[in-house]
């Protein structure tokens, strides 16, 4: 996989989505010399970070014909990780002290993340490449090129041919629903975190929240402010778990998984506890879903594994004309988007070559066999966990990009440890000022900020 000889080839590329992945993909593709068109159905950049109070009429997302609301952001959402490790490599996510309307907290709100993405788009003139209010209807291979059919908000249709398509459309819109024995006869209401915005609808209810990571931890505590009782069912908990959690209203309990649901409205947990619940909130993640993508049955999503996909990016027989940015689940999301985009851009230009189709398929076969031997379920194929930095550094070496910084890696590790150990307070109480200082000193050394790090470090929480 050595660098290929010149000349550099300029491709006509469609990027699907103008969220955090699509924005940096567009920048990297243009930097590499490609012509780029970004297609996005919304009126502004930001993707899932654009908050809307609207939710889908089908709260479980079971109706394939439903109008889809792509945002999953709830009103009280703050980031799960420190801001300094979230940003792109050369555009740090630092406080904007010159603007009093901005959120300078280390774990800021979703509004601040959106503002950061808007700043990024402005800084690199990305909006000039974007067609807003454009819904992609179909993407398919045609004679070695890619046909993209779309329609605008005004009803105009487009049928265009591109050299390549980069999929940056996210994977937080198709809810994954827990399978519970007896749920079909249970009379209560069910919803998914995708449709959660504010706690008000749960006032005085007994609520069961399934899942206790990130959104589950947040939403259960948000609901506890108004609910009568909140009971969290967690697959990670031992079977006999029954623990009261410290929240102001003293009304939050942690359980093991749900065992059964019953027509009398009761929910039975595997710890033997029984509650009569009004609502179940599924905080159980999302499915990968690409309804407009036609690959002549070459690709599929099987048990939430997108396959075949070399290094989570390239479908071997369709590469490099089709690629995916942002599929792996990891802490360093924006950074990953940037590194993956650099690789895609370099491959499309011919500056970096991919292995042969057979070599990529052999690599995938070995990867899947290793995963199975380790007992890792297929549905976790795109969850990189502790191997995320190894993955990113491997791609970085291909593109001549620096490895993940020590402070960035450790902020993610320690940040998630705090989330698990102190879910009520982790955003405002931390013990890694050394890493934060290292990050800001790094930004200053690279001339990425125009103020001394102490200005923020001494400002407190």
UniProtKB/Swiss-Prot annotation:
Enzyme class, spelled out: oxidoreductase
Phenotype caused by lack of the gene: No visible phenotype in leaves or seeds; due to the redundancy with other FMO GS-OXs.
Annotated binding of NADP(+), by residue: 211-216
Residues holding FAD: 17-22
EC numbers for this chain: 1.14.13.237
Its biological purpose: Catalyzes the conversion of methylthioalkyl glucosinolates of any chain length into methylsulfinylalkyl glucosinolates.
Family (UniProt): Belongs to the FMO family.
Protein name: Flavin-containing monooxygenase FMO GS-OX4
Organism: Arabidopsis thaliana
Species lineage: Eukaryota, Viridiplantae, Streptophyta, Embryophyta, Tracheophyta
